[in-house]
Regions:
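Beta->alpha turn/N-cap motifs
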Residues: 5, 20-24, 46-47, 98, ...
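Short secondary-structure boundary/capping segments
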Residues: 9-11, 32-35, 58-60, 85-86, ...
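C-terminal effector-binding regulatory domain of bacterial HTH transcription factors
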Residues: 117-126, 134-175
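Alpha-to-beta junction loops
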Residues: 13-20, 41, 106-112
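Hydrophobic hinge/microswitch elements
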Residues: 87-131, 138
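Flexible hinge/capping segments at coil-to-helix
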Residues: 28-67
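Secondary-structure junction motif
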Residues: 65-84
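Central regulatory/effector-binding core of bacterial HTH transcription factors
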Residues: 1-26
Length: 175
């Protein structure tokens, strides 16, 4: 198992299992890819940041409370354009290369983040985050579970891989 970074090739002769985020199912020799989670992303924030009054998601309001970006500015630029909101020339806000850091910043009330509903579902259900709009981005993207077709030679590695895949299947069934 590896921690895969966006835009980096994964060597499946050395890696058994990986997750990727893509707009189409990955196809390559020696791998099996299956859809895992939807990438559909919506604006979310901490209830403490939003308060109890209804929120109008204008560019002014969003810039006032702060935007939290995942990897780059494209998500918010797309969301603002799709929402018929004027896209400012400059989009300030922290940029996170790791989704878990982005999520932590949103939970801590540091701003509004565009997050995959599948990834923050428990936070929304438990009231740790609130969804601010149905308008979404990355609807065409999904998280994919990719497995190498090669069977690990090492018995311990085979067992670890199977244990992990069984755990993933159980977790997905319970979700």
């Amino acid at each position: 198992m590896i921690y895969a970074h966006h835009g980096h090739e994964i060597d499946f002769t050395a890696t058994d299992v990986a997750f990727t985020f893509a707009d189409t199912r990955p196809v390559a020799e020696g791998i099996l890819a299956e859809p895992f989670l939807s990438g559909r992303s919506v604006p979310v924030a901490s209830p403490a940041l939003v308060g109890t009054d209804p929120v109008t998601l204008s560019a002014e309001w969003l810039l006032g409370v702060g935007l939290l970006h995942d990897s780059d500015l494209s998500g918010w630029k797309t969301w603002l354009a799709r929402s018929s909101t004027v896209v400012p020339d400059r989009l300030p806000g922290a940029i996170f290369e790791d989704f878990n850091l982005l999520r932590a910043a949103a939970l801590a009330g540091q701003g509004v983040a565009l997050c995959s509903l599948a990834m923050v579902g428990p936070d929304l259900k438990e009231g740790r985050l609130v969804q601010l709009s149905e308008s979404s981005v990355l609807d065409e993207f999904d998280y994919y579970l990719i497995q190498s077709n090669l069977t690990p030679r090492d018995a311990g590695r085979r067992k670890a891989r199977q244990t992990f895949l069984s755990w993933i299947d159980d977790a997905r069934t319970q979700a």
